[in-house]
């Protein structure tokens, strides 16, 4: 299981806990460190917001680097003989791993927790994009000008190379960054079998445990210690 963290993640503690849980289910787990996070940021910074900023070219280049890192790693796992490779991503991490799945079929299962799938909405309408759109507007850049350039960077405009039965999406009913209506539209477009909502907002820690437990229910055979 490849775990892809969210934007501005500060601690590895919670992720290590869930990797240990995966080990108990018979899975290996690894946490990908995205650009400008953990060992990939300046030691003088507590965290870095450089992944997403008003400089949209830089934002897209950072996303591309994240996706290529994932691509290289998953291909490496396949070459050494991993029989089943799954991906779990939350928020920005879910955006990244969804982009990988739009052109690569290495992953067999995909778990997305409050994923950022409609990038245009995130930038121009969500609370998270307030400062970005303020600066873009100051530069005279409009939504109609940015939309065409998101074609290769927005999961809502593509489709993963997985069957719908192999995708699990978990969202928050009060999430204003990845709202239910967007996830419901994605469910229809991607023909996703497993979509669940809980009464929480964005980046609620309880959804991590809920997502893994739902995966255990949805794909019981794949998480069985005896399936080998």
Regions found by a protein language model. Name each.
Residues 85-87, 110:
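Conserved alpha/beta-hydrolase fold motif
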Residues 88-97:
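Gly/Ala-rich beta-loop-alpha elbow adjacent to hydrolase catalytic centers
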Residues 1-6:
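Short beta-strand element of the alpha/beta-hydrolase
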Residues 8-12, 16-24, 29-64:
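Cap/lid segment of the alpha/beta-hydrolase catalytic domain
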Residues 57, 67-84:
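Conserved acidic catalytic loop of the alpha/beta-hydrolase fold
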Residues 122-188:
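The feature captures the conserved acid-bearing segment of alpha/beta-hydrolase catalytic domains
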Residues 184, 197-214:
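Histidine-bearing beta->alpha loop at or near hydrolase active sites
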Residues 99-143, 197:
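Hydrolase active-site cap/lid region
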